Amino acid sequence: MMAGMKIQLVCMLLLAFSSWSLCSDSEEEMKALEADFLTNMHTSKISKAHVPSWKMTLLNVCSLVNNLNSPAEETGEVHEEELVARRKLPTALDGFSLEAMLTIYQLHKICHSRAFQHWELIQEDILDTGNDKNGKEEVIKRKIPYILKRQLYENKPRRPYILKRDSYYY
């Protein structure tokens, strides 16, 4: 009887370790997929004039995922009819709702990852440079003639400032 309990205990331990390893593999796989997705998105060349539509769509999807909890729900101003309709939906679409919830959770994790937030800031900077471009060009236009003038007209050797000015320096 003792041997039977030891065998059952060993089987339970093997089952537990295998399930833990499967969970860690799936988490590592998710992290790898997220990293690949974000590096491909970040390393692709970004045009300053035109932002690719899929990147803007991803930004829109992230804003939609972030706005799932509307302000009306947070303050408690939701009508009872809407709550009843929402309660009936998961029971009718059981398998689909679980898959949709998992997809929304994965999108939520991707949208809140640090790499994506960094890419989003870069994207906003690129979109804002179109507005600030005129101001930067004015600054450059003021500096360029001075630099060109200094480079073009410095053909003669510089006069040492320590020595006295005499006629032979002119």
Curated annotation (Swiss-Prot):
InterPro entries from the UniProt entry: NeurotensiN
Protein name per Swiss-Prot or TrEMBL: Neurotensin/neuromedin N
Site for Cleavage, residues: P160, Y161, I162
GO biological process, one term: neuropeptide signaling pathway
Quaternary structure (record): Interacts with NTSR1. Interacts with SORT1. Interacts with SORL1.
Keyword vocabulary terms for this entry: Cleavage on pair of basic residues, Cytoplasmic vesicle, Pyrrolidone carboxylic acid, Secreted, Signal, Vasoactive
PANTHER family: NEUROTENSIN/NEUROMEDIN N, NEUROTENSIN_NEUROMEDIN N
GO terms of molecular function: neuropeptide hormone activity; neuropeptide receptor binding; receptor ligand activity
Function: Neurotensin may play an endocrine or paracrine role in the regulation of fat metabolism. It causes contraction of smooth muscle.
Domain of life where this protein originates: Eukaryota
Family membership noted in the UniProt record: Belongs to the neurotensin family.
Pfam family, any one: Pro-NT_NN
Location in the cell: Secreted; Cytoplasmic vesicle, Secretory vesicle
Modified residues (Pyrrolidone carboxylic acid): Q151
Stretch forming the signal peptide: 1-23
Organism for this UniProt entry: Homo sapiens (Human)
Gene Ontology CC: axon terminus; extracellular region; intracellular membrane-bounded organelle; transport vesicle
